[in-house]
């Protein structure tokens, strides 16, 4: 009887508390506690969303919808801590008009060497696809590697960051206070290895449930931010390859919302980056979204559909080369154009060019169905236009690419993303600055991302050495707070290995000493003493702490060859 009263008393007291952070407890929670827990969760989420972290961010769902999907055992994630750090970095650098610029790291060595100089780490999907997938099958960046490939690389780098952070902290705190002050004043303070990781999520690797699972995996593995591009899953290509297919604008917004929803459920502050490839993509997977209609290409005269022409040719025994040639000929002869261009031509031919401005004004922002009604009324007749005839064999629509479609998409993505990434085919500073101006006119202060891609032949674009040197900072002034050389790690790895291998063939150890050891000493590269770099001293310290008399088995004892340095 006393025990029952005690339990009831405990439950009653807990039910009155609003500080319950989990219902996974014993004694088991009451209905009143469950109601209190849910209500507090909703209030916490709403307060979280109202913070400066989410200023200007739009969600198509309520805090109740998030809380009801969270379960009763909330967890915390290290990636969310890193995300808050990343948000603060972007906030400060954005105010200063300075860049957060980084090089893509492909392994722990590159991560540690960039940590003293770059504020973030970037993990490229291209690099993962070509260097290390979870099946060990390497290939071009077609987005067809297992979806856990990049998260696994993030996990690898994040774990390495953890080790080197512990190692650096151990070394730093082993110094006297006076020595730490002295080094700090000399600019030789503790290295921060916990640089926030930004990772490549490609297209999200599937439908919305796949996108959510991928977002969850990234958060669990340590990524502070991910970027999602508006290409079609299954048709994805590297942003600097031809043949890219983009999805409807609304479909990509759904991916962004799915990612945000997943992280809201997890209670993570991770950042969502929306990338558009529409500046160079020439195909669209569906015409379902009216906002894409003005850029879809069609024909203005009845013609046998392209897909039908190709299938007929194949059925008649045409070779692959013959079919490809036939496709090029059809596309060239069809004279494709947008509906607006078709209307302008029709009005001009009908002697009604004075109606063009009226049409463009009335049709602006309208669906193709509505635009057709406006055009037919002004023309006094039906204007023929067929955007289905040019569809590819896969059913994709041809679209007009360029900076205008990219701006329109970026503006549509902006309310749902923390940063906007414009993928371009050339390193055009003026184009990027114009893009930034258009975006920031509607979304003041919006952070932008630029890929300083190695796919560009930088020396062939007319930049002087001084212009190349200032390019990153010039971009930053326009709002491109995040800039990255996505494959710098891959290329620097290749160059260093190529030079060493070439010279080692004929010069033997002289090549190694000249190109590696002497350079490591000159530059102060800590991998010179690779045992210490890998954490041998740190681990010895732990072992000697738990086991006395272990100096004879210490890995860094007098017999270690590293004492030669």
UniProtKB/Swiss-Prot annotation:
One of its GO terms (molecular function) is isocitrate lyase activity. Optimum pH is 7.3-7.8. Optimum temperature is 40 degrees Celsius. It catalyses: (2S,3R)-3-hydroxybutane-1,2,3-tricarboxylate = pyruvate + succinate. The keyword Lyase applies. Its main location: mitochondrion. Its EC number is 4.1.3.30. It is found in: Mitochondrion matrix. Inhibited in the presence of NADH and NADPH. When Mg(2+) is present, Cu(2+), Hg(2+) and Zn(2+) inhibit the enzyme activity in some extent. Pfam families: ICL. Induction: Repressed by glucose. Pathway: Organic acid metabolism; propanoate degradation. GO terms for cellular component: mitochondrial matrix. It comes from the Eukaryota. Belongs to the isocitrate lyase/PEP mutase superfamily. Isocitrate lyase family. Component of the methylcitrate cycle that catalyzes the formation of pyruvate and succinate from 2-methylisocitrate during the metabolism of endogenous propionyl-CoA. This is 2-methylisocitrate lyase, mitochondrial. It comes from Yarrowia lipolytica (strain CLIB 122 / E 150).
């Amino acid at each position: 009887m006393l025990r029952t009263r005690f339990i009831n008393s405990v439950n009653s007291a807990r039910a009155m508390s609003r500080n319950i952070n989990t219902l996974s407890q014993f004694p088991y929670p009451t209905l009143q506690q469950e109601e209190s827990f849910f209500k507090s969760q909703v209030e916490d989420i709403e307060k979280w969303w109202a913070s400066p972290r989410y200023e200007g961010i739009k969600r198509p769902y309520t805090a109740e919808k998030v809380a009801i999907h969270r379960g009763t055992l909330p967890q915390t994630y290290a990636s969310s801590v890193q995300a808050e750090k990343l948000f603060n970095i972007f906030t400060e650098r954005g105010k200063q008009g300075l860049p957060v610029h980084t090089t893509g790291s492909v392994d722990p060595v590159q991560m540690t060497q960039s940590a003293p100089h770059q504020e973030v780490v970037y993990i490229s999907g291209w690099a993962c696809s070509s260097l290390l997938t979870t099946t060990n099958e390497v290939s071009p960046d077609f987005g067809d590697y297992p979806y856990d490939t990049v998260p696994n690389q993030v996990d690898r780098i994040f774990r390495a960051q953890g080790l080197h952070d512990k190692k650096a902290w151990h070394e730093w705190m082993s110094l006297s206070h006076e020595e730490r002050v002295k080094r700090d004043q000399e600019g030789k303070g503790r290295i921060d290895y916990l640089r926030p990781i930004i990772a490549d999520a490609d297209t999200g690797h599937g439908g919305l449930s796949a996108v959510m699972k991928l977002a969850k995996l990234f958060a669990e593995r340590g990524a502070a931010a991910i970027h999602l591009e508006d290409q079609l899953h299954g048709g994805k290509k590297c942003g600097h390859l031809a043949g890219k297919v983009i999805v409807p604008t609304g479909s990509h917004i759904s991916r962004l919302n799915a990612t945000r929803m997943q992280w809201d459920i997890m209670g993570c502050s991770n950042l969502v980056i929306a990338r558009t490839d529409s500046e160079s993509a020439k195909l669209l997977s569906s015409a379902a979204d009216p906002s894409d209609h003005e850029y879809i290409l069609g024909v203005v005269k009845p013609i046998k559909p392209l897909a039908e022409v190709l299938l007929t040719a194949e059925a008649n025994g045409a070779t692959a080369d013959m079919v490809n040639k036939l496709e090029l000929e059809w596309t060239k002869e069809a004279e494709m154009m947008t509906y607006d261009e078709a209307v302008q031509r029709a009005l001009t031919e009908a002697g009604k060019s004075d109606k063009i401005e009226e049409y463009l004004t009335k049709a602006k922002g309208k669906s193709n169905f509505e635009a057709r009604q406006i055009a037919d009324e002004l023309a006094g007749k039906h204007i023929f236009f067929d955007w289905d005839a040019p569809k590819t064999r896969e059913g994709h629509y041809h679209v007009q690419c360029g900076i205008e479609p990219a701006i329109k998409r970026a503006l549509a993505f902006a309310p749902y993303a923390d940063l906007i990434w414009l993928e371009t085919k050339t390193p055009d500073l003026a184009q990027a600055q114009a893009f930034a101006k258009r975006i920031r006119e509607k979304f003041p202060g919006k952070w932008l991302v630029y890929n300083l891609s190695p796919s560009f032949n930088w020396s062939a674009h007319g930049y002087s050495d001084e212009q190349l040197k200032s390019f990153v900072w010039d971009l930053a002034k326009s709002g491109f707070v995040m800039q990255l050389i996505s494959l710098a790690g891959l290329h620097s790895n290749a160059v260093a290995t190529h030079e060493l291998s070439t010279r080692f063939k004929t010069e033997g150890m002289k090549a190694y000493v000249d190109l590696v050891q002497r350079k490591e000493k000159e530059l102060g590269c800590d991998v010179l003493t690779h045992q210490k770099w890998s954490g041998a001293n740190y681990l010895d310290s732990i072992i000697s702490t738990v086991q006395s008399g272990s100096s004879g088995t210490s890995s860094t004892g007098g017999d270690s060859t590293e004492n030669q340095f």
